[in-house]
Amino acid sequence: MDISADVDQIIAQAPDWTFAGDCALLALMKRISQNLEERGERTSRNLRDFETSVKQVDIALNNATTSLRSLQFGNQFVEYRVEEVDDADLAMPEEKKKKPELPLKSSEELAKEFLENNLRMFRKNYEPVTIEVPDSDDEDGPVHSTTVFRAKNPYDAIPLPYIIGTKEWQEHKYAGLYDSKENSEDDRSEEFSSSSSDEKEPETKKIATPANKLEEQHLSDSSSLASFAREPAIVSPVINPAVQVAEPVIRTQPRPIINSQRNPHERDMFAALRQSPPSDDPPSTSSSPTSSPAFRNPSSRLPIVSTASLSSSSSSPAQQPPRLFDEAVSTQTPKEAEIKPSQTKRMPVNLFNEDEFKSFMSEIVDKVQSKTPSSSVSPATTISTKEPPKTKKPVEEYPKPGPPKQIVEQTVPKRVNLFDDSPPLSPTPRSEPVFNNTKATGAIPKRSPVVVANNDEDNSLFGSSPAMPKENPSKKPPKPVTKSLFDDDLEDDDFLSSFTPKAKPPEQKLLSKPKPSLFDDDDLDIDDIFTKPSAQPKKLSERVAGKTSLFEDDDQDDVTDLFGSKKAKVIPKETSSGVSPNKNVETPVASKKSLFDDIEDEDLFGTPKAKNLIRSEPDNDPEAVGEDKKQSEIAEQKSKNIETGEKQHQVIAENASVPILRDSPPPMEVTEQKSDDKEWEAVKDDTSAANITKSKDLFSEDLTDDELFSSTSNNMAEPKSANETNEFNKPIEKYTSQTEENVSPVNPPTKLSIKPTDLFNEDFSDDDTFLSASMSKNEPLVGTENEDIKKPSEVQLVKEIKAEELPQQLPENKIYEITAVVEKDELVPEMLSKPQIDEPVSETPPPDDYQSNVDPIISMVADVTNKTSVDTLTPRKPADLAAAQQIMQNYSNLFSDEPPDDSEFFQTLGSSGLSSLSASKIFDNEHDFFEPALPNIPSATKPSPVTPGDQPSVSSDYGAMCLFSDVPPEDNDHAGEEVQKEAEPQKDELASTTRIHTIFYDDFSETARAGAVQPAPKRFPFDDEPPPADETDRSEVKETPELQKPTSPVKKLKMPNININVHALLPGSGSVPKLIRKQESSSSERDEPQATVQTEAEAPSSGQNTVSSADGVLQHVNKSRARGPAKRRPSTRRGRKENYAKSLLDAGQNEGPTASTRDSPEVEHSERSSIKAPSPQYVKPEKLFSTPAQQIQPQLQRPPPSNTGGSFLDSPDEDDSFFNSVPTKTVEGKQGTDPPKSYRSFLDSPDADDKLFSDLENNKAGINVVPVEKKPPKMANSFLASPDEDDFLFDSVKTNATTTAQKAFAAEIMNAFQKVTTAPPKPSNAKEAAKPKSQAAPKLFDDSDDDDDDLFARAPSIQTASKPVQAKQPPKPAATSLFSSDDEEAEVPVKSAPAKKLPVKPSKSLFSDDDDDDDLFGGSSTSKAAAAKKTKPAARTASKPPASKTTTPTATIPSNSGDNPLADLLDFK
């Protein structure tokens, strides 16, 4: 759009501006805007098209990933054929084309060919047998010899496979087909492989269809013919009829290749089956691309193969992956087809072995150990030549690599590639045999692009014996590409890349001394991931040279070796080639196994994890040197202590068996994870850990979740078992990580290193992934390519490696035992970390969530650091959150098959960063599900019952559990910790409340909290004695967060609870609770005060279980609590009914100052008893709840009537520290005697009430004394200062982890109290109501005491206003029943008849709020004013409390204040 001319014209008119200029300018502007709009639409349309195309590509890529993964994990059904299958059937179309040429032959030629074919068939299928028949009975008679042709038994040469499912079939890698004679087996294996490969090799079939046909015929001949010599002769004639002369040569060559390969495999290589099976397996898994290209290359490589027959035979399988590239290039299409059959033959063998037979792998490994050295030696010579081409290969990667690969791969590369292909198929778990790894790699070849890079890497891995050295340089370049490809493209690719990097390190180990620079360069050029893999290649080469040590590791512990090999990889990269060789020998197999561990075998996966843990330790040794240098900046002592401690600890801390595994295995996984992690890290530094976890998890999705969890839990436990590492990390991390964890989001490298270490050590929910990420990060540190990533990875590596060492070990029990011995506290986080492992389900979200989690985590870390004096908890909590969130997101993928909904839950929960929904609870619920964790919590009253993981620090680590556990660590820190905790739970609740399912999980967390709340009070009992002031401080600090918290619980109530609460609370008057809730919803302030009052009530309810259930809270929540507390409730209800009836009678008799005085001492006693009770509650909540709690609560509830005036005063006194207005209230409060008595209660209550609030609220949630009757004051106070009581309630509740549950109860309790509690005071209200009518001013205070009861019982006040006498009499029974119903309602059952009374009267009470307006003018105005105060404080945060304070002193003021509160109440309603 050219507007320059128009602009020039307009500018020219500027001096003489006219309306025409305006019009021109407007037109120009319109043109510009239209042009912008058009361009914007076009751009947006292009963007939409691009987005669509990206989505399409993503879907296609996901489909490819799914198919590849199904192949890798063996989920795809592969038919094992016992009968021979001719490739001719597959090649029919081409043969038909050729057939038209055949008819040209003359009849003579046809007849001759017919005879030849018949003779050939006859010779092939029949054998001459000479039978001597004596002419006569005479021995001397002439003997006539007759030659008979007897049909050959095709299975004379071809062995029948073992019966499927038999021990031999399971133990033998080739199911009994491979040990047979070479000729027959070659043919047979060819046929099998051809069938499997043809299925997957359409291209090769098409290309060399004629060759395949002839070849197939020959193959059938060879299989049928007893002697292999016949086959070649037969083959040549067959070739002539085939008409393809070029292919006959190829065919002849393929057979020699087959012979060289097959024979070596059968003879030398059969001893080293690991190599040959890998070649077989890759074809089976990815038959066409890998198998055909491999053979194509072998045909071209035959001369090289001849140079080293063993190496060629072993290498030909390895070369197959390169042929994938070759196949893309399709340099030798006819040869490919012919060579395919040979590979195909191998493939079926692998198919039989597949990943299923670890025992086979170990046996084969033993065999290979004996024979691989020779094969490795011969390939080494060829490899040196091939190495440069391989280097080229990585660069060219797909099309170009083809020709170089042919040259390079002629001998060794095949084997290496096959191995590389195999490891993805059978993840490292199969450390025992290398061929298992090769099998795993076989699956990988299907990903042709990935396979290319992987093949290069794999070449180093599998060719390590033959071609490790030369592949080192070349593989390093390919790895970066593959990793980037894998990282970008597929998680599977990431797996492959992780495996491939491992392959590289082995070569490097062979070349480690000559090519140390290669490691450094590769590390720098490519991510450290690649450098570590390069170390592995050295290990492989060493393995080839000294397979004994490698296989010894395999023989001892295949899994261990896998990790050990990884260790070796990591070590050579990082520090000294000298060290790496030692571990390299151990690790070579291990590296592949670790690959398999991640991908294929669930069982293997479980063990590999343990091995990964081990690996991490060895990684620490070599990497420790590099890491120590870098970490020394962060924490020199940490890394050194951890490294030394880990090395020693690995062996010592773990079981005797573990140490061996640790020494060798950890490096393998470290390299794998590093490779994956590095890839991810390159993309997503901080999130790399999460991503890595995802990729591994993705591969392990097929794996059993239990195994994953167990392995992760093991990881968690083991880092702790290596307490030296954890302890060293923790003390340092406690300081650094607490400070740095807060900063960690900003500086992920350094602070993440410390923090992730704790995170990973403490939270191994993503142990494998995080460990891998940390490992990869550490490697990058060595590489220095990504310094940012490296920095965090260093610390993380040290910590994660420690974590990995322990976590990867399969024996979870051992790990737990070790951790238990080392640090019982750590075990709990480990348990929690298990759930976390499950959590990070979402593959992509975890990185973002991880970073986003870092912020909540940081805030939580800050809170935790303040909260938990135990520093270990601090690192764990952020780590748990990040890990749990990532894991929850990844968890969906891991368990996507089984619980996609849950995974979504976890993802959402993880993203929300809810502490209450933290992995520990979710997973505890999943594993333990409902009863195991919940009953334990209430019964023991400690977090430990929830789950061993939840017990110590882990519970504190998790937001929901932290409320429990954080309090336990230290009472002194409790106030600050609770404040932080409150903020965290608020965030969590806000995030979680929107989702019903999150609420559902919150309810579980609430039940856990309810159980844990009681334990929290223990601390308060400790705090209760010294710090009433401290508690007030806590409340002050927490006031704002507390207000927020109540709202979130209200939301939860609203979400699923509203209906349930209404019905449960008020079967008769469901409308009343709804109104109350509407009010709550209408004003968050009121909701908060109600929540605070309710939380106070709930605190007692949680302590006594009666109140909580009485609210008619969600039944499922109550059920969860009922599991533990169910035993308590019945006794509590009855005890409460009886005690409260007595208290009502006493209160009714003692309405005057005596009642108030008695109430105040009772309050003190109740407080003291409650204080005493909390400790018993911790020990046995049932006892306290059954009797002491019941008695205390009635007493407390009784005293409050007297204290009501006092309770307002009391709350001020408690608020005293906050408001300092208590003395004025007390002076004004109850004119003469009442104020002193109220003073007693207040003076006592500040101390005792603080204890009550700390002990009762925390322990028993305040045992109703303060909470129930002080609710109105607390409401007012809480609104003014988010009342001390509320703060205490929230502190105690939060610390007790009742925040959500109690909050949910809070709204309900508010309803119940406003209804039920109003009913209970009715007797006193009825008696006093008559008096208040006559004596408004003096008894306002007395009544305010009783009226506070009236406040709780608004209905009675109404009744009293209308019928004072009757109200007195009926209300008492009603009150008892009502209150008992209150207790009952507090308990889940609303069934009790009194509950019905409640609804009726509470409904009146709701109406009574309106009636209270009249009553305010009437004699019971004081009680109504008090009731107004109760609700009104919610409405008026600041203004109301003074009004309430003033109202108590004078009758006139209460009426006025009553009017205002009523107006507020009406407004709310």
Swiss-Prot record:
Residue ranges with Low complexity bias: 276-293, 306-316, 1417-1426, 1434-1452
Q: Where is this region: Disordered?
A: 178-349, 367-546, 571-591, 607-760, 933-1254, 1316-1469
Q: Which GO terms describe its molecular function?
A: phosphatidylinositol phosphate binding; retromer complex binding
Extent of motif LFa 8: 698-709
Residues with the modification Phosphoserine, per the entry, are 136, 227, 422, 426, 580, 1241, 1245, 1254, 1344, 1380-1381, 1408
* UniProt keywords, alphabetically: Phosphoprotein
- Would the keyword Glycoprotein turn up in this protein's UniProt record? no
Give an example GO biological process: nuclear envelope budding
- Give residue numbers for the modification (Phosphothreonine): 587, 693
Give the compositionally biased regions (Acidic residues). Answer: 519-528
List where the motif LFa 1 lies.
351-372
Q: Where is the composition biased (Basic residues)?
A: 1118-1136
Locations of Basic and acidic residues compositional bias?
A: 197-206, 387-399, 626-649, 671-687, 971-990, 1031-1042, 1077-1089, 1159-1170
Q: Where is the motif named LFa 6 mapped on this chain?
A: 595-605
GO cellular component terms attached to this protein's record: cytosol; early endosome; nucleoplasm; WASH complex
- Positions occupied by motif LFa 5: 550-563
Identify its protein family. Belongs to the FAM21 family.
Tell me, what does this protein do in biology?
Answer: Acts at least in part as component of the WASH complex which may regulate wash nucleation-promoting factor (NPF) activity and is required for its membrane targeting during endosomal sorting.
What interactions and quaternary structure are annotated? Component of the WASH complex.
Q: What's this protein's name? A: WASH complex subunit 2
This protein's species is Drosophila melanogaster (Fruit fly)
Q: What is the phylogenetic placement of the source species in the record? A: Eukaryota, Metazoa, Ecdysozoa, Arthropoda, Hexapoda
Primary gene name = FAM21
